[in-house]
């Protein structure tokens, strides 16, 4: 999970929100 966070921090942020939303801006 730590590695995934380093690769896609924005994606993890959305997941932490409680919703699985891919925020790729």
Curated annotation (Swiss-Prot):
Naturally occurring in which organism (per UniProt): Delftia acidovorans (Pseudomonas acidovorans)
Protein family (similarity comment): Belongs to the peroxiredoxin family. AhpC/Prx1 subfamily.
Subunit and partners: Homodimer; disulfide-linked, upon oxidation. 5 homodimers assemble to form a ring-like decamer.
GO-annotated cellular components: cytoplasm
GO molecular function: NADH-dependent peroxiredoxin activity
Gene: ahpC
Entry protein name: Alkyl hydroperoxide reductase C
Main location: cytoplasm
Top-level taxonomy: Bacteria, Pseudomonadati, Pseudomonadota, Betaproteobacteria, Burkholderiales
Further details from the record: The active site is a conserved redox-active cysteine residue, the peroxidatic cysteine (C(P)), which makes the nucleophilic attack on the peroxide substrate. The peroxide oxidizes the C(P)-SH to cysteine sulfenic acid (C(P)-SOH), which then reacts with another cysteine residue, the resolving cysteine (C(R)), to form a disulfide bridge. The disulfide is subsequently reduced by an appropriate electron donor to complete the catalytic cycle. In this typical 2-Cys peroxiredoxin, C(R) is provided by the other dimeric subunit to form an intersubunit disulfide.
Top-level taxon of origin: Bacteria
Chain's role: Thiol-specific peroxidase that catalyzes the reduction of hydrogen peroxide and organic hydroperoxides to water and alcohols, respectively. Plays a role in cell protection against oxidative stress by detoxifying peroxides.
The keyword Zinc-finger appears for this protein: no
Keyword terms, alphabetized: Antioxidant, Cytoplasm, Disulfide bond, Oxidoreductase, Peroxidase, Redox-active center
Catalytic activity: a hydroperoxide + NADH + H(+) = an alcohol + NAD(+) + H2O
Cell location: Cytoplasm
EC number: 1.11.1.26
